[in-house]
């Protein structure tokens, strides 16, 4: 908490993946699960929400200096979600401090576009017996948009190639619905076909054509165009970036937490669908996810199903009849009308 409390700290950036927010999509509030309850009871802190909340509580007591908390995760309105879970948490401890956070701490929404695989031991670390815990491996491409009207934040970040915009929604949409949705689709499709890495599955002509048609026919038509931004060119660049074999981006990593990612990346597009489109590709992607849960793949490649809902999902797909229907009826994932089902 010392860094959060220090009045010299002006900006904190957050990158923890979607599940690190403990946000209940259905109720639009903090998910009071076992880890959050643990943190509220002041046991050994387990969550980002706990660390950040207690740090801001101490900052309130020490100096009440302004601070920017910047989420860099793949969530629509990520800053609003982070602010909501933190204020929900703190309000259970001290409502006055929660009000200060609500009014004074800034949580801008952002879109960060740079593929960053999970970094474990790299070959040279093994060979040279060298370890760097701060190492981040990523692709050369990067884009960072921040929704912001404050000149103060711009002054803090003046030497960075950050694009400040009045409304982040368009940039969120293209990242989530084109890049992230394609990543998830390729993960489930690729694992079923026995591939391990993104560059392998995108190099399969059938898989490339599938994703390309999915984006052209079912995704891009739902995105409202802005200025002179070329959505087709962005799509082509994304698919080209996926071919970078140096990243060694594991499909198993991308396939994690599907119950959180699918509503945001895949289903949200379907809910805003064009009435003249049948959405065959979207249906196939969801079917691939269900088969992924059943560990059905043609090369018998073994992978782990890591998901906060894994117990419930695996029980449905492995032990219950009409399992696809039961999964589609899970409101916290699909939340579909009868017409959309």
Task: Give residue spans per PLM region.
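Substrate/ligand-engaging "lid" and interaction regions
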Residues: 1-341
């Amino acid at each position: 908490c010392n860094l959060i409390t220090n009045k010299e700290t002006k900006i904190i950036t957050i990158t923890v993946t979607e599940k690190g927010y403990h946000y209940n999509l259905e109720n639009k509030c903090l998910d009071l699960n076992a880890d959050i309850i643990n943190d509220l009871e002041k046991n050994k802190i387990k969550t980002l929400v706990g660390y950040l909340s207690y740090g801001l509580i101490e900052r309130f007591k020490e100096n009440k200096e302004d601070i920017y908390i910047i989420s860099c995760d793949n969530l629509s309105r990520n800053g609003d979600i982070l602010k909501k879970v933190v204020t929900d948490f703190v309000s259970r401890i001290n409502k006055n401090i929660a009000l200060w956070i609500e009014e004074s701490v800034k949580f801008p929404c952002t879109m960060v576009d740079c593929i960053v695989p999970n970094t474990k031991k790299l070959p040279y670390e093994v060979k040279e017996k060298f370890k760097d815990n701060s190492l981040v491996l990523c692709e050369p491409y990067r884009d960072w948009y921040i929704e912001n009207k404050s000149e103060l934040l711009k002054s803090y970040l003046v030497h960075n190639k950050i694009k400040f915009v009045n409304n982040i929604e368009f940039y969120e949409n293209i990242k989530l619905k084109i890049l992230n949705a394609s990543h998830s689709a390729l993960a489930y499709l690729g694992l079923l076909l026995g591939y391990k890495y993104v560059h392998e599955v995108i190099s399969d002509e059938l898989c490339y054509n599938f994703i390309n048609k999915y984006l052209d026919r079912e995704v891009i038509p739902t995105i409202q165009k802005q200025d002179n931004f070329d959505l087709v060119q962005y799509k082509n660049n994304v698919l080209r970036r996926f071919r970078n074999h140096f990243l060694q981006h594991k499909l198993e990593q991308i396939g994690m937490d599907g119950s959180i990612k699918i509503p945001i990346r895949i289903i949200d597009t379907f809910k805003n669908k064009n009435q003249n489109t049948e959405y065959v590709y979207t249906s196939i992607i969801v079917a691939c996810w269900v088969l992924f849960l059943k560990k059905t793949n043609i090369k018998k490649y073994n992978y782990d199903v890591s998901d906060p809902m894994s117990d419930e999902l695996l029980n449905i797909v492995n032990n219950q009849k009409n399992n696809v229907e039961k999964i589609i009826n899970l409101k916290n994932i699909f939340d579909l009308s009868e017409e959309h089902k």
